[in-house]
Regions:
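Bilobed "Venus flytrap"/periplasmic-binding protein-like clamshell domains
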Residues: 1-33, 37-39, 105, 137-140
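Pocket-lining segment of extracytoplasmic ligand-binding domains
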Residues: 25-109
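Long, contiguous hydrophobic alpha-helical segments, chiefly transmembrane helices and signal peptides
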Residues: 2-13, 41-44, 74-78, 123, ...
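Short, flexible coil/linker segments at or flanking structured domains
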Residues: 1, 11-14, 29, 66-68, ...
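Generic serine detector
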Residues: 2-5, 20, 58, 145, ...
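Conserved C-terminal helix/tail region of periplasmic/extracytoplasmic solute-binding proteins
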Residues: 151-156
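Short secondary-structure boundary micro-motifs
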Residues: 7, 61-63, 113
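Secondary-structure end/capping motifs
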Residues: 84-145, 149
């Protein structure tokens, strides 16, 4: 699912919580129903909502990163290389603006209004779509940490 989330979890485990767990790839989400004491899982996307409240502890990676570094975290960034046709970068900016302005319609069109969680609230209150200097500084810190975690994938 998200290599960034896997690496961020590795950073937090090593640098913030100062633990060195063994990592395994989750082969099947059914394993979550048979967790042993001491087991921990990284869940991403809709799976977070599907399993919410089933475990004694849960942590939001971005919130924990902010506690540890006092910086926001950017899980994804839209970028264009230097020299790219300005029409393309303008098109990316237009698509971003359109998406932000039509979030509610997208939630309805894709059936997320029928989910047991507030998809619109999540998309409008939990995600910041502007890449600013603080997020750039945070990404530099993250990249420079050198943390590499294996396995790098979850089922999905």
């Amino acid at each position: 699912h998200s290599l960034t989330s896997v690496q961020l979890a590795g950073y937090l485990l090593a640098k913030h919580w100062k633990v060195s767990p063994e990592y395994y790839t989750l082969e099947d989400y059914a394993q979550l129903d048979h967790a042993l004491p001491g087991d921990a899982f990284l869940l991403i996307g809709d799976k977070v909502f599907d399993y919410e409240g089933r475990f004694a502890y849960s942590y939001d990676l971005a919130a924990e990163w902010k506690k540890a570094t006092r910086l926001p975290f950017a899980f994804a960034v839209w970028i264009a290389r230097k020299g790219v046709d300005p029409d393309l970068t303008e098109g990316l900016q237009h698509a971003l603006t359109f998406g932000i302005e039509h979030t509610y319609e997208a939630v309805l069109e894709h059936g997320f209004d029928r989910k047991p969680y507030d998809a619109y609230g999540y998309l409008t209150q939990n995600i910041d779509y502007i890449f600013d200097n603080q997020k750039h500084k945070a990404l530099q810190k993250f990249w420079n940490s050198g943390i590499k975690v294996s396995p790098r994938a979850n089922p999905g």
